[in-house]
Swiss-Prot record:
It comes from the Bacteria. It is an enzyme of class 1 (oxidoreductase). The keyword NADP applies. It holds the Pfam family NAD_binding_2. It catalyses: 6-phospho-D-gluconate + NADP(+) = D-ribulose 5-phosphate + CO2 + NADPH. Pathway: Carbohydrate degradation; pentose phosphate pathway; D-ribulose 5-phosphate from D-glucose 6-phosphate (oxidative stage): step 3/3. Substrate binds at residues 91, 117-119, 175-176, 180, 249, 276, 434, 440. PANTHER family: 6-PHOSPHOGLUCONATE DEHYDROGENASE. This is 6-phosphogluconate dehydrogenase, decarboxylating. It comes from Shigella boydii. Keywords: Gluconate utilization, NADP, Oxidoreductase, Pentose shunt.
Length: 445
């Protein structure tokens, strides 16, 4: 409801009159009461709401993904005309969007599955928008979407046509997977700085402030520095009194499931999903901590040196995560015939969304230089960072393993990097085993 309200207010603020409808009359009245003088026109029946719109109608749905979306579409259909456009701005599973696009197209309606990132504030002030569906229908809604989207530093709106049917929601799904990876990498960096150097929250805030002024400049690093200094009403640092169980809404899981379907090694993002799952086993972890032994953690040595190693490890880990995510976008584009433009996708992530970061311009540049590049790690800028920073990543992972500090995504980054650059892997033995017990055959060199 909040996302829908904020998007309506965003659209209204760009000079449009907006018809609004909610199943709950009270919620509709609440929005009107809280926003006097706005060009928001309330309707209390679906029929009146639909009939209030100019044709071709442009209807933005912001409902909970799943059965609720189908129910909302079914309630609209009796009053729609051929050529009307439904835009689904929810966190919808892309296969559902493909199905709805097919079904509605057969009935003469247009359906645009649209990823919207930026949370409640982004919805109000300007989100990153990822629309997928019929190109001609997109052209009819593009003027509105362009006006309400976030604007990058170079003045470009953070919206672009992604591709047919489920392409927009697929890109939003991978965006969310990358978000999981970013957050877990940052959490592991925090754990290392706390465990290895015993940094105070004030020192952590200072460290993240410095990081945010360099290569790691991003929304997530920016909010993390603020989190470290936040205190509760009793004067305690808030981060220290928050239970260590990270919840999830399932979009990270979808990204990993799709990777398995496509045969893509999305190891870092998948480890970030599993890290949330193991965090939720709090009671088991507390019990296990009293039974299972581990090494006694030793100090990490020189403070400035270790902080810099963790910074480098975090940046290279982030690059590996994005390399995996964009590699998966390439595989999905081929599988679903979407013809994705990876440079444009990186561009619209530069503002408005949760993963917005300075280094996204480097991804856009890499694809501008070579649109067919198989993996971002092969692009000159990222290859150079890998050359310069891999030792720091290896040192940090080695320290963590020796001292019993879990770093699943940092470790996944090293393993992926070394596997990807390996001309020969021990998979020949696995294939021999498969042939031995199952006559699966093998290829000779």
């Amino acid at each position: 409801a909040v996302m829908g309200r904020n998007l309506a207010l965003n659209i209204e603020s760009r000079g449009y009159t907006v018809s609004i409808f909610n199943r709950s009359r009270e919620k509709t009245e609440e929005v009107i009461a809280e926003n006097p003088g706005k060009k928001l026109v309330p309707y209390y029946t679906v029929k009146e709401f639909v009939e209030s719109l100019e044709t071709p109608r442009r209807i933005l749905l912001m409902v909970k993904a799943g059965a609720g979306t189908d129910a909302a579409i079914d309630s609209l259909k009796p009053y729609l005309d051929k050529g009307d456009i439904i835009i689904d701005g929810g966190n919808t599973f892309f296969q559902d969007t493909i199905r709805r696009n097919r079904e509605l197209s057969a009935e003469g309606f247009n359906f645009i599955g649209t990823g919207v990132s930026g949370g409640e504030e982004g919805a109000l002030k300007g989100p990153s928008i990822m629309p997928g569906g019929q190109k001609e229908a997109y052209e009819l809604v593009a003027p509105i979407l362009t006006k309400i989207a976030a604007v990058a530093e170079d003045g470009e709106p953070c919206v672009t046509y992604i591709g047919a049917d489920g392409a927009g929601h697929y890109v939003k799904m991978v965006h969310n997977g990358i978000e999981y990876g970013d957050m877990q990498l940052i959490a592991e960096a925090y754990s290392l700085l706390k465990g290895g150097l015993n940094l105070s929250n004030e020192e952590l805030a200072q460290t993240f402030t410095e990081w945010n002024n360099g290569e790691l400049s991003s929304y997530l690093i920016d909010i993390t520095k603020d989190i470290f200094t936040k205190k509760d009403e009793d004067g305690n640092y808030l981060v220290d009194v928050i239970l260590d169980e990270a919840a999830n809404k399932g979009t990270g899981k979808w990204t990993s499931q799709s990777a398995l379907d496509l045969g893509e090694p999305l190891s870092l993002i998948t480890e970030s999903v599993f890290a949330r799952y193991i965090s939720s086993l709090k009671d088991q972890r507390v019990a296990a901590s009293k039974v299972l032994s581990g090494p006694q953690a030793q100090p990490a040595g020189n403070k400035a040196e270790f902080i810099e190693k963790v910074r480098r490890a975090l940046y290279l880990g982030k690059i590996v995560s994005y390399a995996q995510g964009f590699s998966q976008l390439r595989a999905a584009s081929e599988e679903y015939n979407w013809d994705l433009n990876y440079g444009e996708i990186a561009k619209i992530f530069r503002a408005g969304c949760i993963i917005r970061a300075q280094f996204l311009q480097k991804i856009t540049d890499a694809y501008a230089e070579n649109p067919q590049i198989a993996n971002l790690l092969l692009a000159p800028y990222f290859k150079q960072i890998a050359d310069d920073y891999q030792q720091a990543l290896r040192d940090v992972v080695a320290y963590a393993v020796q001292n019993g500090i879990p770093v699943p995504t940092f470790a996944a980054a090293v393993a992926y990097y070394d596997s990807y650059r390996a001309a020969v892997l021990p998979a020949n033995l696995i294939q021999a085993q498969r042939d031995y017990f199952g006559a699966h055959t093998y290829k000779r060199i």
